[in-house]
A protein has these predicted regions:
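An edge-strand/N-cap motif at the start of beta-rich repeat modules
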Residues: 1-25, 29-33, 286
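A short beta-strand motif characteristic of beta-propeller blades
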Residues: 17-23, 52-57, 87-95, 129-134, ...
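Blade-level signature of beta-propeller repeat domains, shared across WD40, Kelch, NHL, RCC1
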Residues: 230-286
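Inter-blade boundary loops/turns of WD-repeat beta-propellers
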Residues: 16, 43, 51-52, 76, ...
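Structural motif
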Residues: 10-13, 46-49, 79-83, 118-122, ...
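Repeated scaffold domains used in trafficking and secretory/extracellular systems
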Residues: 26-35, 59-68, 98-106, 138-146, ...
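Conserved core beta-strand positions within WD40 beta-propeller blades
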Residues: 2, 37, 70, 109-111, ...
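Conserved beta-strand positions in repeat-built beta-propeller and related beta-rich domains
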Residues: 5-9, 40-45, 73-77, 112-117, ...
Length: 286
């Protein structure tokens, strides 16, 4: 099992130990796994890098996703969702909410957290045509998809901050609140067993299937921004505390710190020989 991390030290890969992968981006903030490839974004300097190509990003990019072999970006500054062609040039741009800050891909659709407009927007791919908008309580800020069921974090109140965790079925339109939690929206992810992991405020919580009560509640985080689940492992990136952690989820155990320092997006990738593209061939310790 291999882990990728965007950090102040560059793109890092962990498979038993950390390696630095040479790229033109000195300080990547976001990443997206596209098969055996990894796309990187430096949202501060507005740079995108993939397969040896460097291109320009719109301002305020919050999210980088991969659909098939094409990239998607979501900008909270332009309020737009953008689909790129196979050479990473902007292909289609569509308005998507007010200060949108997260999205998830389900088959040939992308679900966008419209944030300040109070809606979850559904766009078709590849034409980025809006086909539905679901009004939800508060400002939806984080979303994860489990088939046709969305799990979301929505900010109900900023002072003091309160976050609503809820599920929404795209097939039936059924809305199901899970929990009202103290703190800011951080991150949400769905495990292989369809249970929920959520970072809210300074906590990491786990909700079993069909339960409104967490069976795991861990504290002492800054504000978790990225979560990724795979094969009973949970990868955690906590930029506010400046650390990346890994934990077993079955049964849950204490998170193990993998990296300390300024960090951003993270994801799992294959660790099998031969799956990495040529630009990753020269590996050095960070």
């Amino acid at each position: 099992m291999e882990v990728y991390l965007a950090s102040a030290a560059g793109l890092l890969s962990w498979c038993g130990k950390w390696r630095k992968i040479p790229t033109p981006l000195a300080h990547p903030t976001l990443l997206a796994a596209c098969g055996a490839d990894v796309a990187l974004a430096d949202s501060v300097n507005r740079l995108l890098y993939r397969q040896g190509r460097v291109s320009t990003l719109p301002p305020g990019v919050e999210v980088l996703r991969c659909w098939r072999n094409q990239l998607l970006t979501l900008s909270s500054e332009t309020n737009c969702l953008t689909l790129y062609d196979a050479h990473d040039y902007p292909l289609i741009t569509s308005p998507a909410g007010i200060r949108p800050c997260d999205c998830a891909i389900v088959d040939c659709q992308v679900i966008v957290c419209g944030c300040e407009d109070g809606c979850l927007h559904i766009f078709s791919l590849p034409d980025l045509r809006e086909i539905a908008a679901y009004p939800v309580p508060g400002c939806p800020m984080r979303v994860a998809a489990d088939g046709r069921v969305l799990t979301c974090l929505s900010l109900l109140s900023p002072d003091p901050p309160q976050t609503l965790l809820f599920r929404l079925c795209l097939t039936s339109g059924d809305f199901a609140p899970v929990a009202l939690l103290p703190g800011w929206c951080g991150a949400v992810a769905i495990a292989d067993d369809h249970t929920i992991w959520a970072g809210v405020g300074e906590q990491l919580l786990h909700f079993p299937l069909d339960s409104v009560v967490p069976d795991v509640q861990l504290g002492e985080f800054g504000l978790i921004r990225f979560l990724s689940c795979q094969q009973s492992k949970l990868l955690i990136s906590d930029p506010w505390a400046g650390r990346c952690l890994l934990m077993d989820t079955t049964p849950p155990s204490a998170p193990h710190q993998l990296y300390a320092g300024e960090c951003g997006g993270c994801c799992f990738a294959s660790c099998r020989k031969g799956t990495l593209p040529d630009w990753k061939a020269s590996l050095n310790e960070p």
